[in-house]
Regions:
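ABC-type nucleotide-binding domain
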Residues: 26-282
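Cytosolic ends of transmembrane helices, especially the final helix of ABC transmembrane type-1 domains
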Residues: 1-19
Length: 282
């Protein structure tokens, strides 16, 4: 037990040192009024380990549209979504939001433009109400509950012993995966940012939870700039544009219809997933 504690402590120290080694990101707290298009212009990126993830990525995610990132595992989908919000600084090329280079925008100011709904939801040992209020710390209880209802949180919250004031445990351990994700979506409703970064998070859910979350997401993304990491092709059939990432580059981009007709990488992925879904024991 003591050895495990020592190993855990050393690992945490190593992670902290890695964070401290990163230069402090700075930038202006002023934003342009040119909308919220996200543009990747010949972007290249490598982690500190030297591993090159993106080689030459260019595409535009337009305001009011859903842009879906698809591709094989390790193709760069998750990295692209995080670079859009300047989780890290790129090695070459340029990323702009509303015409402004993200490397010149103060990180806190930039993040104010984003609502982020990823698979790994971070929750705290507090009530449902306070976990949602993280989306907007100045929101009233009424505003928090209104956002929660848009995300279908009320479907389970009002059945709990203390309702909205129920403590959900460390990282939401008292809740199911679907319930945790609905809280994450409620935060995004409460923040009401113009850009949504979304990691499709319904693959491991039961049918009821998946339906509730998809309904909530449809409400959330209306009229926003939406960049979604897609794992299942059927969920992006309604996207305005699909960007296929493979081996750190854009292999294809276009509407779902155009890419299906092109019969390239995307069409092949659709075919494979359709065959997988239709498979059954015989």
């Amino acid at each position: 037990q003591n050895l495990a504690a020592v190993i855990s402590t050393r690992t945490n120290i190593a992670r902290m040192n890695e964070i401290l080694d990163h230069p402090i990101q700075q930038g202006s707290d002023r934003l342009s009024n040119q909308g919220y298009d996200i543009v990747f212009d010949h972007v290249g990126f490598a982690y500190n380990t030297g591993e090159t993830v993106l080689k030459d990525v260019s595409f535009t995610a337009k305001q009011g549209e859903v842009t879906a990132l698809v591709g094989p595992s390790g193709g760069g989908k998750t990295t692209v979504s995080r670079l859009a919000a300047r989780f890290w600084d790129i090695n070459r090329g340029k990323i702009t939001v509303g015409g402004m280079d993200v490397s010149r925008i103060d990180p806190e100011t930039l993040l104010s433009l984003y609502s982020i709904v990823f698979q790994d939801v971070t929750l705290f040992d507090n009530t449902i109400l306070e976990n949602i209020r993280i989306g907007n710390k100045d929101a009233t209880d009424e505003q928090v509950i209104a956002a929660a209802k848009l995300a279908n949180v009320d479907e389970f919250a009002e059945k709990l012993p203390d309702g909205w004031h129920t403590n959900i445990g460390e990282n939401g351990c008292e809740l199911s995966g679907g319930e945790r994700q609905r809280i994450s979506i409620a935060r995004a409703f409460l923040k009401n940012a113009p850009i949504i970064l979304l990691d499709e998070a319904t693959a491991s859910l039961d049918v009821e939870n998946e339906t509730l979350i998809q309904t909530a997401l449809s409400r959330l993304i209306a009229d926003k700039t939406v960049l979604v990491i897609a794992h299942r092709m059927r969920t992006v059939a309604g996207a305005d544009k699909i960007v296929v990432l493979s081996d750190g580059t854009v292999a294809e981009e276009g509407s779902p219809k155009d890419l299906e007709e092109k019969n390239g990488v995307y069409a092949h992925m659709v075919k494979l997933q359709t065959e997988s879904q239709n498979w059954k024991l015989s």
